[in-house]
Amino acid sequence: MDYAMKSLSLLYPRSLSRHVAVSTAVVTQQLVSKPSRETPRARPCRVSTADRKVRKGIMAHSLEDLLNKVQDILKLKDKPFSLVLEEDGTIVETEEYFQALAKDTMFMVLLKGQKWKPPSEQRKKRAQLALSQKPTKKIDVARVTFDLYKLNPQDFIGCLNVKATLYDTYSLSYDLHCYKAKRIVKEMLRWTLFSMQATGHMLLGTSSYMQQFLDATEEEQPAKAKPSSLLPACLKMLQ
Protein backbone atom coordinates (compact mmCIF):
# COMPACT_ATOMS: atom_id res chain seq x y z
CA MET A 1 0.00 0.00 0.00
CA ASP A 2 2.81 2.40 0.88
CA TYR A 3 4.59 1.51 -2.35
CA ALA A 4 1.49 2.35 -4.37
CA MET A 5 1.07 5.68 -2.59
CA LYS A 6 4.68 6.58 -3.32
CA SER A 7 4.20 5.71 -6.99
CA LEU A 8 1.11 7.89 -7.18
CA SER A 9 2.93 10.73 -5.48
CA LEU A 10 5.68 10.55 -8.11
CA LEU A 11 3.09 10.89 -10.87
CA TYR A 12 1.60 13.98 -9.22
CA PRO A 13 2.31 17.15 -11.30
CA ARG A 14 3.98 19.09 -8.48
CA SER A 15 6.49 16.37 -7.71
CA LEU A 16 7.08 15.83 -11.45
CA SER A 17 7.80 19.52 -12.00
CA ARG A 18 10.13 19.50 -8.96
CA HIS A 19 12.13 16.60 -10.42
CA VAL A 20 12.34 18.31 -13.85
CA ALA A 21 13.55 21.55 -12.25
CA VAL A 22 16.24 19.71 -10.29
CA SER A 23 17.42 17.85 -13.41
CA THR A 24 17.57 21.11 -15.41
CA ALA A 25 19.59 22.77 -12.67
CA VAL A 26 22.08 19.88 -12.66
CA VAL A 27 22.49 19.98 -16.45
CA THR A 28 22.93 23.75 -16.40
CA GLN A 29 25.53 23.51 -13.65
CA GLN A 30 27.45 20.89 -15.62
CA LEU A 31 27.44 23.01 -18.76
CA VAL A 32 28.61 26.08 -16.89
CA SER A 33 31.33 24.19 -15.07
CA LYS A 34 32.89 23.00 -18.37
CA PRO A 35 35.57 25.39 -19.70
CA SER A 36 34.41 27.10 -22.93
CA ARG A 37 36.91 27.77 -25.70
CA GLU A 38 36.79 31.40 -26.83
CA THR A 39 36.64 32.00 -30.58
CA PRO A 40 38.89 34.80 -31.88
CA ARG A 41 37.16 37.99 -32.82
CA ALA A 42 37.02 39.13 -36.42
CA ARG A 43 39.73 41.65 -37.22
CA PRO A 44 39.88 44.13 -40.10
CA CYS A 45 42.43 43.36 -42.80
CA ARG A 46 43.32 45.01 -46.07
CA VAL A 47 44.42 43.05 -49.12
CA SER A 48 45.91 44.27 -52.40
CA THR A 49 47.02 42.66 -55.64
CA ALA A 50 50.65 42.47 -56.76
CA ASP A 51 50.38 45.64 -58.85
CA ARG A 52 48.62 47.51 -56.00
CA LYS A 53 45.76 48.51 -58.31
CA VAL A 54 43.02 46.58 -56.49
CA ARG A 55 42.58 46.98 -52.72
CA LYS A 56 39.92 45.25 -50.62
CA GLY A 57 38.89 45.44 -46.96
CA ILE A 58 38.12 42.07 -45.33
CA MET A 59 36.99 41.00 -41.83
CA ALA A 60 38.60 37.65 -40.89
CA HIS A 61 38.73 35.53 -37.71
CA SER A 62 41.86 33.59 -38.64
CA LEU A 63 44.45 33.15 -41.35
CA GLU A 64 42.47 30.32 -42.93
CA ASP A 65 39.34 32.47 -42.94
CA LEU A 66 41.26 35.31 -44.58
CA LEU A 67 42.65 33.01 -47.29
CA ASN A 68 39.19 31.65 -48.07
CA LYS A 69 37.66 35.12 -48.32
CA VAL A 70 40.52 36.37 -50.50
CA GLN A 71 39.99 33.42 -52.81
CA ASP A 72 36.28 34.24 -53.12
CA ILE A 73 36.58 38.03 -53.46
CA LEU A 74 39.47 38.07 -55.95
CA LYS A 75 38.10 35.01 -57.81
CA LEU A 76 41.22 32.91 -57.34
CA LYS A 77 39.53 29.53 -57.35
CA ASP A 78 41.95 26.70 -58.27
CA LYS A 79 44.79 29.26 -58.51
CA PRO A 80 47.76 28.88 -56.15
CA PHE A 81 48.65 32.08 -54.32
CA SER A 82 50.54 33.24 -51.24
CA LEU A 83 49.92 36.00 -48.72
CA VAL A 84 52.73 38.43 -47.83
CA LEU A 85 53.02 41.76 -46.04
CA GLU A 86 52.59 44.68 -48.39
CA GLU A 87 55.27 46.83 -46.75
CA ASP A 88 58.23 44.41 -46.86
CA GLY A 89 57.10 41.18 -48.57
CA THR A 90 57.26 38.90 -45.50
CA ILE A 91 55.34 35.66 -46.06
CA VAL A 92 52.41 35.05 -43.68
CA GLU A 93 52.16 31.28 -43.17
CA THR A 94 51.30 30.57 -39.51
CA GLU A 95 48.27 31.46 -37.41
CA GLU A 96 50.45 32.70 -34.54
CA TYR A 97 52.21 35.21 -36.77
CA PHE A 98 48.88 36.35 -38.22
CA GLN A 99 47.40 36.93 -34.75
CA ALA A 100 50.53 38.84 -33.68
CA LEU A 101 50.11 41.41 -36.46
CA ALA A 102 48.41 44.72 -35.79
CA LYS A 103 44.91 45.55 -36.96
CA ASP A 104 44.42 47.02 -40.44
CA THR A 105 47.61 45.30 -41.61
CA MET A 106 48.06 45.55 -45.36
CA PHE A 107 48.54 42.19 -47.07
CA MET A 108 49.46 41.43 -50.67
CA VAL A 109 48.31 38.48 -52.77
CA LEU A 110 51.00 36.99 -55.01
CA LEU A 111 50.03 34.51 -57.68
CA LYS A 112 52.37 31.89 -59.08
CA GLY A 113 55.29 33.63 -60.81
CA GLN A 114 54.68 37.04 -59.21
CA LYS A 115 57.23 38.69 -56.93
CA TRP A 116 56.95 41.41 -54.32
CA LYS A 117 58.23 44.81 -55.40
CA PRO A 118 58.54 48.03 -53.38
CA PRO A 119 56.08 50.82 -54.17
CA SER A 120 58.83 53.14 -55.46
CA GLU A 121 59.90 50.67 -58.15
CA GLN A 122 56.32 50.19 -59.32
CA ARG A 123 55.74 53.95 -59.51
CA LYS A 124 58.89 54.34 -61.61
CA LYS A 125 57.78 51.59 -63.98
CA ARG A 126 54.30 53.14 -64.31
CA ALA A 127 55.82 56.54 -65.10
CA GLN A 128 58.04 55.03 -67.79
CA LEU A 129 55.08 53.17 -69.26
CA ALA A 130 52.99 56.34 -69.30
CA LEU A 131 55.76 58.25 -71.08
CA SER A 132 56.19 55.50 -73.67
CA GLN A 133 52.45 55.44 -74.38
CA LYS A 134 52.15 59.23 -74.60
CA PRO A 135 50.96 60.12 -78.10
CA THR A 136 53.21 62.30 -80.21
CA LYS A 137 52.01 65.75 -81.12
CA LYS A 138 50.56 65.88 -84.63
CA ILE A 139 50.27 68.89 -86.89
CA ASP A 140 47.35 69.04 -89.29
CA VAL A 141 48.37 69.97 -92.84
CA ALA A 142 44.86 70.39 -94.19
CA ARG A 143 41.42 69.89 -92.72
CA VAL A 144 38.06 70.14 -94.49
CA THR A 145 34.80 70.19 -92.56
CA PHE A 146 31.25 69.96 -93.91
CA ASP A 147 28.33 71.31 -91.89
CA LEU A 148 24.82 70.54 -93.17
CA TYR A 149 21.98 72.35 -91.41
CA LYS A 150 18.43 73.65 -92.02
CA LEU A 151 17.09 77.11 -91.36
CA ASN A 152 13.52 75.98 -91.99
CA PRO A 153 12.10 72.49 -91.37
CA GLN A 154 10.38 72.62 -94.77
CA ASP A 155 13.65 73.05 -96.66
CA PHE A 156 14.46 70.31 -99.15
CA ILE A 157 18.11 69.86 -98.26
CA GLY A 158 19.09 72.85 -96.17
CA CYS A 159 22.36 74.72 -96.06
CA LEU A 160 25.87 73.39 -96.48
CA ASN A 161 28.89 75.11 -94.99
CA VAL A 162 32.29 74.03 -96.27
CA LYS A 163 35.35 75.14 -94.33
CA ALA A 164 38.94 74.36 -95.28
CA THR A 165 41.89 75.00 -92.96
CA LEU A 166 45.56 74.82 -93.96
CA TYR A 167 48.26 74.36 -91.31
CA ASP A 168 45.79 75.63 -88.67
CA THR A 169 46.50 79.17 -89.92
CA TYR A 170 44.77 79.85 -93.22
CA SER A 171 41.07 79.12 -93.53
CA LEU A 172 38.50 79.42 -96.30
CA SER A 173 34.77 78.87 -95.91
CA TYR A 174 31.85 78.81 -98.31
CA ASP A 175 28.19 78.76 -97.34
CA LEU A 176 25.85 76.99 -99.77
CA HIS A 177 22.14 77.72 -99.19
CA CYS A 178 19.74 75.17 -100.65
CA TYR A 179 16.10 76.14 -100.13
CA LYS A 180 14.27 74.81 -103.20
CA ALA A 181 15.01 72.77 -106.29
CA LYS A 182 15.51 75.87 -108.47
CA ARG A 183 17.64 77.43 -105.80
CA ILE A 184 19.72 74.28 -105.66
CA VAL A 185 20.32 74.42 -109.41
CA LYS A 186 21.21 78.12 -109.19
CA GLU A 187 23.64 77.51 -106.38
CA MET A 188 25.21 74.64 -108.31
CA LEU A 189 25.58 76.84 -111.39
CA ARG A 190 26.98 79.67 -109.27
CA TRP A 191 29.48 77.28 -107.71
CA THR A 192 30.40 75.93 -111.17
CA LEU A 193 30.83 79.48 -112.48
CA PHE A 194 32.99 80.39 -109.53
CA SER A 195 35.15 77.31 -110.14
CA MET A 196 35.46 78.08 -113.84
CA GLN A 197 36.41 81.70 -113.16
CA ALA A 198 39.03 80.61 -110.67
CA THR A 199 40.34 78.05 -113.15
CA GLY A 200 40.35 80.66 -115.92
CA HIS A 201 42.32 83.11 -113.79
CA MET A 202 44.83 80.39 -113.03
CA LEU A 203 45.13 79.46 -116.71
CA LEU A 204 45.52 83.12 -117.75
CA GLY A 205 48.19 83.70 -115.17
CA THR A 206 50.03 80.56 -116.20
CA SER A 207 49.80 81.37 -119.92
CA SER A 208 51.07 84.95 -119.43
CA TYR A 209 54.00 83.70 -117.40
CA MET A 210 54.84 81.10 -120.08
CA GLN A 211 54.56 83.78 -122.80
CA GLN A 212 56.98 86.05 -120.96
CA PHE A 213 59.37 83.17 -120.52
CA LEU A 214 59.26 82.29 -124.22
CA ASP A 215 59.73 85.95 -125.26
CA ALA A 216 62.76 86.25 -123.04
CA THR A 217 64.38 83.15 -124.53
CA GLU A 218 63.71 84.34 -128.10
CA GLU A 219 65.34 87.72 -127.41
CA GLU A 220 68.47 86.06 -126.08
CA GLN A 221 68.95 83.90 -129.20
CA PRO A 222 69.29 86.83 -131.78
CA ALA A 223 71.70 88.63 -129.46
CA LYS A 224 73.98 85.62 -129.50
CA ALA A 225 73.70 85.20 -133.28
CA LYS A 226 74.85 88.80 -134.15
CA PRO A 227 78.54 88.49 -133.11
CA SER A 228 78.94 85.30 -135.12
CA SER A 229 77.60 87.00 -138.29
CA LEU A 230 80.03 90.00 -138.07
CA LEU A 231 83.12 87.81 -138.04
CA PRO A 232 82.92 86.56 -141.71
CA ALA A 233 82.34 90.14 -142.96
CA CYS A 234 85.52 91.38 -141.27
CA LEU A 235 87.51 88.54 -142.79
CA LYS A 236 86.31 89.47 -146.30
CA MET A 237 87.37 93.10 -145.84
CA LEU A 238 90.87 92.07 -144.80
CA GLN A 239 91.27 89.98 -147.93
Swiss-Prot record:
Q: Name the Gene3D superfamilies on file.
A: 3.10.20.10
Per the UniProt record, one Pfam family is CIDE-N
| Documented effect of changing residue 125 to A | Does not affect ability to mediate lipid droplet fusion
**Annotated phenotype, changing residue 128 to A:** Abolished ability to mediate lipid droplet fusion
Residues of the CIDE-N domain: 41-118
Give, from the UniProt record, the effect of changing residue 112 to A. Answer: Slightly inhibits interaction with PLIN1
Q: What is the effect of changing residue 115 to A?
A: Slightly inhibits interaction with PLIN1
Single biological process term from Gene Ontology: negative regulation of lipid catabolic process
| Keyword NAD set for record | no
* Reaction(s) the record says it catalyses: a triacyl-sn-glycerol(in) = a triacyl-sn-glycerol(out)
UniProt-recorded name of the protein: Lipid transferase CIDEC
User: Which organism does this record belong to?
Assistant: Mus musculus (Mouse)
